[in-house]
């Protein structure tokens, strides 16, 4: 086992705080509408220019092990806030730095670290309660666009495209972000349920120009096994043909004689039909077939529930207004399923989302909810260069997550104003003893830090602006982008409540741990091995003798 180096109390905390300050100073430069850029060097390719706090934090690794521990713990604040709320990483870093710096000073002055921690925790609990009181629900597209714009570093084009995407697919809809091929941002919306399986044979195509299959008001047959014998299908085909209806068959596979018969009947115009493979595999395939059944008001023909294909009737089939099938995708538009059944299915899947521990499963379940409840929107990010594309895509990701957070828990006035109003509301809070009360005061002072940093990055004097904002009430604050004072909501400067709440709670959590740290242990640096003495002069093979 390698030897360890151990440092204690003040020496440990000062090394840790040095690491915290290095990381925080790099990250907080990006805060606010006039935040600065940070350039990140990469081992290959061109450097990345970013204004995204979490991207900066992730890149930082310090040479000194004890300083690095402080930096890594602060990095945890940024990534935890980003994972939970999607934004607020820089705010969380600024809050944590202020709490740690003041807290460690108080410990050095002889205060009890445990009481300081209790005081900070007490202030944060009161602050979170106050934030919830200030919070207003996001009801309209304008508020959603404003939140997205702020999160995307004041880029209105990103804010508007996210608001439009949310309007089209609903709050439950899935919005995915891809790299575009043009200079402009684009939005593609897929209505209804789409899955990534195309037609089993190109002979089903009935729209030669678009090379797709279009079915109007078709019946939809859902089966969980392979279909190779045409006799199994005869009852259903006869019933559908008698009604002069069209038919979509979704099964594990349609092959051999069955596929050939369907193609021949389709070409002759006896019945307009298309066969596609069921999406997914195993249990996920069964679940997706059930989703389709609920959406279209049909039943999955499965031996597990005592239904066989040859005994199926039109009452077992689903219905939809329109179905489009291309080479790669099938889209079911306006399924005729019962709304209560669809809502029940959505609730059931949401319960599974809450219970699952796998990120992959959660993502797939959320996709299923979207396909049932809303739709899928794809935002294609446009940019002139690859460097700009990556930076812009990261901002769109942030903005989307922040917007979802705003829809979830509402919004508060942005620009650090909400925390200033919280300070005023809980300024009379007292602890059980003097040290706890000092901990509360540390937390209240730290809540000024985000506004101070936004103002400093805009090139103004933080104390002057802070005092003027403190004199105001409600939404009154400072718009760093224009240098004006006024109502932050009217300026369109809003923050999701969830983002500010998460930033404050995560910052206090790490600060509490650091303030109460008494010893730090790291692997001792290896001493360089002494180099062996060089061989003497003389001829080789002569033992270095000189002649």
Swiss-Prot record:
The keyword Isomerase applies. GO terms for molecular function: ATP binding; ATP-dependent protein folding chaperone; isomerase activity; unfolded protein binding. It catalyses: ATP + H2O + a folded polypeptide = ADP + phosphate + an unfolded polypeptide. ATP binds at residues 30-33, 51, 87-91, 415, 479-481, 495. Pfam families: Cpn60_TCP1. Residues 535-547 have a biased composition (Gly residues). Keywords: ATP-binding, Chaperone, Cytoplasm, Isomerase, Nucleotide-binding. The keyword Zinc does not apply. Belongs to the chaperonin (HSP60) family. Together with its co-chaperonin GroES, plays an essential role in assisting protein folding. The GroEL-GroES system forms a nano-cage that allows encapsulation of the non-native substrate proteins and provides a physical environment optimized to promote and accelerate protein folding. This is Chaperonin GroEL. The gene is groEL.
């Amino acid at each position: 086992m390698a030897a360890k180096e151990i440092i204690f109390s003040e020496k440990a905390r000062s090394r840790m705080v040095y690491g915290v300050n290095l990381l925080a100073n790099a990250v907080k430069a990006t805060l606010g509408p006039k935040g600065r850029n940070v350039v990140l060097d990469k081992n290959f390719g061109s450097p990345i220019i970013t204004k995204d706090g979490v991207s900066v934090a992730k890149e930082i690794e310090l040479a000194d092990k004890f300083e690095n521990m402080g930096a890594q713990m602060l990095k945890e604040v940024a990534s935890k806030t980003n994972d939970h709320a999607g934004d607020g990483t820089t705010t969380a870093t600024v809050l944590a730095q202020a709490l740690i710096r003041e807290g460690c000073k108080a410990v050095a002055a002889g205060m009890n670290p445990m009481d300081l921690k209790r005081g900070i925790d007490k202030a944060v609990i009161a602050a979170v309660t106050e934030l919830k009181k200030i919070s207003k629900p996001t009801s309209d597209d304008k508020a959603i666009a404003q939140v997205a714009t702020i999160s995307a570093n004041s880029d209105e084009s990103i804010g508007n495209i996210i608001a439009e995407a949310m309007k089209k697919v609903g709050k439950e809809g899935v919005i995915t972000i891809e790299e575009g091929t043009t200079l402009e941002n684009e939005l593609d919306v897929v209505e209804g349920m789409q899955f990534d399986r195309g037609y089993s044979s190109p002979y089903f195509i009935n729209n030669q120009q678009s090379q797709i299959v279009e079915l109007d008001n078709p019946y939809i047959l859902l089966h969980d096994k392979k279909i190779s014998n045409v006799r199994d299908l005869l009852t259903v085909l006869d019933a559908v043909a008698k009604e002069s209806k069209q038919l979509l068959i979704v099964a594990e596979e349609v092959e051999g004689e069955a596929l050939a018969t369907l193609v021949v009947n389709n070409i002759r115009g006896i019945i307009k039909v298309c066969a596609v493979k069921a999406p997914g595999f195993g249990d996920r395939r069964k679940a997706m077939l059930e989703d389709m059944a609920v959406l279209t008001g049909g039943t999955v023909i499965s031996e597990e529930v005592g239904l066989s294909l040859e005994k199926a009737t039109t009452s077992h089939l689903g219905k939809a207004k329109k179905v489009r099938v291309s080479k790669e995708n099938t889209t079911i538009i306006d399924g005729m399923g019962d709304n209560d059944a669809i809502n029940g299915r959505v609730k059931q899947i949401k319960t599974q989302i809450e219970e699952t521990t796998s990120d992959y499963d959660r993502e797939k379940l959320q996709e299923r909810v979207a396909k049932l409840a809303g739709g899928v929107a794809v935002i294609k990010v446009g940019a002139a260069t690859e460097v700009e594309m990556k930076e812009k895509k990261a901002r769109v990701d942030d903005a989307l997550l922040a917007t979802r957070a705003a829809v979830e828990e509402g919004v508060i006035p942005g620009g650090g104003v909400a925390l200033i109003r919280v300070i005023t509301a809980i300024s009379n809070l007292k602890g059980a003893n003097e040290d706890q009360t000092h901990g509360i005061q540390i937390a209240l002072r730290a809540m000024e830090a985000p506004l101070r940093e936004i103002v400093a990055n805009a090139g103004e004097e933080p104390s002057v602006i802070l005092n003027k904002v403190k004199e105001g009430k409600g939404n009154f604050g400072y718009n760093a982008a224009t240098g004006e004072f006024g109502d932050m909501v009217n300026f369109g400067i809003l923050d999701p409540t969830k983002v500010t709440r998460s930033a404050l709670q995560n910052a206090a959590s790490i600060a509490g741990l650091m303030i109460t740290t008494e010893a730090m242990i790291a692997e001792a640096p290896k001493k360089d091995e002494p180099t062996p003495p060089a061989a003497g002069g003389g001829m080789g093979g002569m033992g270095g003798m000189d002649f």
